[in-house]
Amino acid sequence: MSYLKFDKNLMINLEQSLPKEMLRTNQSGAYHCTTIVDCNTRKQHGLLVVPVPELGNSWHVMLSSLDETVYQHGAPFNLGLHRYQGGVMNPNGHKYIREFDCESVPRTTYRVGGVILTKEKIFISGANRILIRYTLEEAHSPTTLRVRPILAFRDASALCDGYPRLFMQFSQQPQWTYDPHWYNGFEYVKDLERGVPYTEDLWVPGYFELPIKKGESIIFSAGLNEVDPSTLPQMYEKEIAVRTCRTSFFN
């Protein structure tokens, strides 16, 4: 049993969940870091942060986060959570979280009505790539998953103002909708507390959308090179097989 496990009561209480940060690294020098409710509170937070030797000895936030939305009967349920200027939290997707654990990989369980969806994140050991596996554990009607990437492309110690290409792929063929706009006024509370610059605007180019069936898993990949999407499930299973289960403080 995982000792890094938090229930709904803690996860929906942002005074308890927001201060809890999670850092994952790999052998290529990339990292993923955010809070356990996937709300970035520092400029260094990001879903995929990588070294770019051509731009100096620093890390660069490529993919800040993803906004996932579950659709049932045409109704959207946004699982994302961000803090905007003035301390405004939106869209409050943390209220759907039922459990978070980190026994082998970070795993968040969401419940939206009759839908139970899990999200697991894992780094590929020797490459600048993160995989996210979405599994629809329960559903009583047709369900659609929409994934909206929020891009930064900046130094991890700077704010957004010759980068590598970022390849975003799915294990199944998604529908892409080009819907470009800026998300304005992200606020990083830890930087605010430190008295350093703490707000920025981030670019959203559009969104991916694909149906997901009960018992089905869909894998999202973000990396600096393109891969064969059909290999993503095997890539995920190979990576998770070498992970150590975190069942105590000592392992």
Regions from the PLM with identified roles:
Residues 1-250:
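Terminal accessory carbohydrate-recognition/targeting modules of carbohydrate-active enzymes
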